[in-house]
Curated annotation (Swiss-Prot):
Binding, Ca(2+) 3: 133, 135, 137, 144
SUPFAM superfamilies xref list: EF-hand (SSF47473)
Protein name from the UniProt record: Uncharacterized calcium-binding protein C50C3.5
Alphabetical list of SMART domains matching this protein: EFh (SM00054)
Source organism (scientific name): Caenorhabditis elegans
InterPro entries on file: Centrin_CML-like (IPR050145), EF-hand-dom_pair (IPR011992), EF_Hand_1_Ca_BS (IPR018247), EF_hand_dom (IPR002048)
Residues the record lists as binding Ca(2+) 1: 60, 62, 64, 66, 71
Amino acid sequence: MPVAKDNQFWDALMENKVAKKLIKKHKCKAKCENIDDLANRYEVSKQEVEKVFKIFQLMDDDGSGTISSSEVAKMLNELGIDVSPKVVQAVMRSSDVSGDGQIDFEEFLAAVTSKIKLSTVKADVQLMLSKIDNNPEKVISAEELVVAWSETVSTNITVKEACALIQQADTQGRGKATIHEFITMCQTV
């Protein structure tokens, strides 16, 4: 499934060991401009912007300032991930916001930071759900979700937002979702 491979690509790319290995392997000379602005806009540290920039440079073999589908394929291969055209298309589709067939640095940074944030949210949600009950078949209501969310996650949600999440997770149309359904829904995001 391309989406899973797309996530596998981003996860492998940002894994500390892989990133460090790739950065050591290639010497990056250019500096990222507007680090402060980008860090603020994408709500990440300056160090994270610099790290992502170095990885971007590694992928930009021709020095064009953009990453092409062939450069994505090459990086997928280096990461040991399936290099089928569908996987490359999934990565390009998830990142190329402008639709020009190339991924510029800001598009790359946006994709990476969204994956980092999503990973954090998923971990928070799983922790939150484990606090509700260890029984994956336990049914939770929107109200229970609001309480558990406020005790675990750094943001609050309203009952209306919780209802929308429950509705999305509820595979049987009963207005409630099991913890298993909720985790499954979170993993498919």
